[in-house]
Amino acid sequence: MEVDQIPLADVVFVIEGSAINGAYINELKTNYILPTLEHFTTGSIDEREYLIAERFATLYGIVVYRTAANLLEPVCSTYGPFLQPQKVMETIERLPLVGGGMESCAHMAEGFAAAHGCFDDISERRQLLDQTSVQRHCILICNSPPYQMPTTESWKYPGKSCEQLAALFNERKINLSIIAPRKMPVLFKLFMKADGDQPITSKNYAKNIRHLVLLKGYSLKERAPSPNSMAAQMAAPNAAQATVQQQQQQQQNQAGQQQQGQGMPMDTTPAQQQQQQQQQQQQQQQQGNPQQQVMNMNTMQQQQPGPNPPAGLLNPQQQQQLLQQQQQNQFVSNQMQNQNFQQNVGPGQNRWMYPNQPGQARPPFMQGAGNVGGVGQGGGMQQNPNSALISRINAPPPNQTVTSLQQQQQQQAQQQQQQQQQAQQQQQQRMQMLSQQQMLNHQQLQQQQQLAQQQQQQQQGQQQQQVNPNAGNNMMPASNAGNMSNPQQQQQQVGQQSNPQQQGNPQQQQQGNSQQEQASLREKIWTGVLEWSEKPKSDQQKIPHTLQCTVCTNIKDGEPEIKAENWPPKLLMQLMPKHLVGNIGGQFLKDSKMVVFRPTPGEALDSLAKMMTSGYAGCVHFSSIPNSPACDLKVLILLYTPDRNAFLGFIPNNQAMFVERLRKVIQQKQHGNMQQQQQQQQMMQQQGKSPMELQQQQQQQQQQQQMQQDNSQQQHYNQFQLNMQMGGGGPGGGPGPGPGGMPMQQNQMQMNMMQQQRMPLGVGVGVGVGPGGVPNPNLQQQLQQVAPNVAAMQQQQAQQQQQRMVRPMMSNNNPGLRQLLQHQTTPGNQFRPQMGGQNPNQMGAGGPMVGNRNFDDGNYEFM
């Protein structure tokens, strides 16, 4: 899938930052947030390539709102915008979804206001890129209802309630989706407000029956409806019948005991016992209105034909019949409300009224009446009217109502099936029509493309033959192979599209139409050969590859964005590690133009895709052709995206800076490789040497360092003597027969002794220290005697320096001083004492030496 075929979208997640929502965030993230990101990125977020410009990417934002318990923190926090979905997931995982202070509500209105502000900022960025047709989605993830108070912290949307901000989403054409761990009526109301008071669809996207998932503008994987408890009963009918029979027997025993306690006659028939048992069971299961029962009893008495029996016998029977009718009405209403119930329960089954099932309740009534009639006249005269009345009251009404309702439901189901079949037939007809149109359009496009390719190839072949006949002969087989592969592709595509059963759903067809429309917005600007060499792992020769391909670019203002009139017919590409391209700097790839390479299928394409998926990128060089205008481009970076199977070329706008930076990165890489090789060689040499040789090598290095230190100390000592001669002489410039000549010679000798004593102390080896490291006592006594003379000498030098400052012309007569001043820059650094063990070459007249440092450039934004 190509880049421009991805629908652009702006997605803002509004998340409740409380502990009650954080307890379910992992489940919501796995089931809904991650599939949402995969939907907008059209693939797995782990395999996606992120070297893509902002104008071709989906922008994400995150808004976190809190409760009233967070008094010292702002109500809302925003993160983003992000170009990479991985950063969105990392940010959501790091959100502090804790606290909340056991509040039952949260500042949802403030979160909606902040989301509106985020969409305003993103729309400004889209307008700079001339992108107006962008989908906008706001996804709410919460577990608490909103406070009934308007916004106070939003300066752009002040005083707005949560419902007003939800309605504003509909006005601004922003799709609001809601994901919550539990179902709340307030969320349904907000979703309807944001949808323009439209009814909520019956699609189920929830993984758990308790979750609330309301989506608008996009869809996830639909889930099956929640399983009904009736399925378990259908799976084990024998166990259910056994339990029902046991309950009936227990209820019969209880009814017989109650009859004995109330003083009822003991010679009741089994039919009467079952009637009383049914009456008690129905009274326990139903809580109806007594007034309605009395009214229904009166109506039933009016409808009964024949003489009225005694009141003591009719009241329980009529009450039983009325209770059965009420239960049947409730059963019918439950069937109308719950669609899954009717699917799981068959037409001949009854879930709640077990006594009315055929073969259980009614045959004992009729059999009991016949048996009692043959016992005696008294018993028969008393029981036959009752049994006939019971059969006339109980049997007809339930059967008529249930059968009529079942027939109506069957008719409705048949009508729905017919409507579904008609809709499916219409969809199939539309799909066939669309497939035929697509086939015709595709064939026409392919024919046009073939003609254009043939013409361009002929022209290029003629040009190449004029320039280089051998190159033309080498290119002809590749072009012929490309032309031969096109009819095979056409036959495969026509064969795939001609079979309607192999076609996908209408969404795939719509995507195909949109792909064709977007592909028509691109124009082919170049057709030629791409050449590169593959170096195997072993020390073999490089394997050259050539690939026939075309380059397409976007159309802007009716013209192609990039012109390839001066491009050479053959482009040379060099494979390089992808991390080197990242080290160049992301600003070059962001400030670039993009083209799409469409290569011809073959072995060369497979090898190139295999190399690029293993971590390589292509650096395409534009070479100049003699007797033709020069090409403005120098370098093009070619990248491969496996999830879309597309080769994308990025052309930096600043070619000179990009080439210079690329050269520096390659030099640094080569320098680092050379250093690694040298280190490896040294390690190998050291591993081959014996321990005695290693010790001798270390001793030699130490002696060299000590010699360097001694030389530097001798240089400093000579320089110190020159300075002393400059300051201690008379007008003649030296320690001659002037007034101060003899004392200065003595002072010079004393300073020499001081210097000889001090300098070995800093180095660790010298005159003042014996072989065992014990200081010489004679030298210490001499130093104690010289110390007062040194103080007097320093005072005399200060007085003479003041005299020279009063008479500056005197220094011109001293050529040694003039020469020293010319070479001397910063005396403070020259007379700085050397610390023990320090390398004198590290500090010089100009501070620390920086000439030997390697190139280190940290100003670039590394990816």
From Swiss-Prot:
UniProt keyword terms in alphabetical order: Activator, Nucleus, Transcription, Transcription regulation
Classification via Pfam families: Med25, Med25_VWA
GO CC, alphabetical: mediator complex; nucleoplasm; transcription regulator complex
Extent of motif LXXLL motif: 817-821
Cited InterPro entries: Med25_PTOV, Med25_PTOV_sf, Mediator_Med25_VWA
Start-end of Low complexity biased regions: 225-264, 272-344, 456-466, 485-516, 669-687, 695-725
UniProt function note: Component of the Mediator complex, a coactivator involved in the regulated transcription of nearly all RNA polymerase II-dependent genes. Mediator functions as a bridge to convey information from gene-specific regulatory proteins to the basal RNA polymerase II transcription machinery. Mediator is recruited to promoters by direct interactions with regulatory proteins and serves as a scaffold for the assembly of a functional preinitiation complex with RNA polymerase II and the general transcription factors. Required for activated transcription of the MtnA, MtnB and MtnD genes.
Protein name per UniProt: Mediator of RNA polymerase II transcription subunit 25
